[in-house]
């Protein structure tokens, strides 16, 4: 039996990685994993708590270890955290071990999708728009560098984007 390919979803918070990833995995009969959810399972604490206690550096160390572990699996759809590509090691593992799809979205859509989400430590500020714009400035080049394919998610449902990814990848 041929080895199953992996699909790795990257992009900023609020791009729809987890939601689209679940649909994609279900449609392709693959396992869905979310690196943030896996970190929460392993630590027994939510991401906000890890950020509070260990700082962003501590969280990024955990994330790097988790992405290394998860990308070694076969036949998965993996949703990564928005900042995962900051680390060069993560970019290397994702590129080498699967097909990378960048889910691209606007800051306006990110704001609409994340406005009431208290589980996003980087957005717990008086000016989340400025934070999202700064993150985009810093991270978009990494998404572009690693992506095998780019999909716009602003004006489409998660199911439609998942179907488009399947058609694009010819699964």
UniProtKB/Swiss-Prot annotation:
Q: How is the cofactor bound?
A: Binds 1 Mg(2+) ion per subunit.
Q: Which UniProt keywords apply?
A: Amino-acid biosynthesis, Aromatic amino acid biosynthesis, ATP-binding, Cytoplasm, Kinase, Magnesium, Metal-binding, Nucleotide-binding, Transferase
Q: Where does ATP bind?
A: 14-19, 120, 156
Q: Where does substrate bind?
A: 36, 60, 82, 139
Please give the catalytic activity noted in the UniProt record. Answer: shikimate + ATP = 3-phosphoshikimate + ADP + H(+)
Q: Which GO terms describe its molecular function?
A: ATP binding; magnesium ion binding; shikimate kinase activity
Broad class of where this protein is predominantly found? cytoplasm
| Entries under Gene3D superfamilies matching the protein | P-loop containing nucleotide triphosphate hydrolases
GO terms for biological process, alphabetical: amino acid biosynthetic process; aromatic amino acid family biosynthetic process; chorismate biosynthetic process
Q: Which GO terms describe its cellular component?
A: cytosol
Query: Subunit info?
Result: Monomer.
Protein name (database record): Shikimate kinase
Q: Which organism is it from?
A: Psychromonas ingrahamii (strain DSM 17664 / CCUG 51855 / 37)
Taxonomic classification: Bacteria, Pseudomonadati, Pseudomonadota, Gammaproteobacteria, Alteromonadales
Which gene is transcribed and translated to give this protein? aroK
């Amino acid at each position: 039996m041929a080895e199953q390919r992996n699909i790795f979803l990257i992009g900023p918070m609020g791009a729809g990685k987890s939601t689209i990833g679940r649909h994609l995995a279900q449609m392709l009969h693959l396992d869905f994993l979310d690196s943030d959810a896996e970190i929460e399972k392993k630590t027994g604490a939510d991401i906000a708590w890890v950020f509070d206690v260990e700082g962003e550096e501590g969280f990024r160390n955990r994330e790097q270890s988790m992405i290394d572990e998860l990308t070694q699996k076969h036949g998965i759809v993996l949703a990564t955290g928005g900042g995962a590509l900051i680390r060069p090691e993560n970019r290397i593992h994702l590129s080498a071990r699967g097909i990378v799809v960048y889910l691209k979205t606007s800051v306006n859509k990110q704001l609409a999708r994340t406005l009431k989400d208290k589980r996003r430590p980087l957005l717990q500020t008086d000016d989340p728009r400025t934070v999202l714009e700064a993150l985009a400035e810093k991270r978009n080049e990494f998404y572009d560098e690693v992506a095998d394919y780019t999909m716009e998610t602003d004006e489409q449902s998660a199911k439609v984007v998942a179907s488009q990814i399947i058609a694009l990848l010819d699964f």
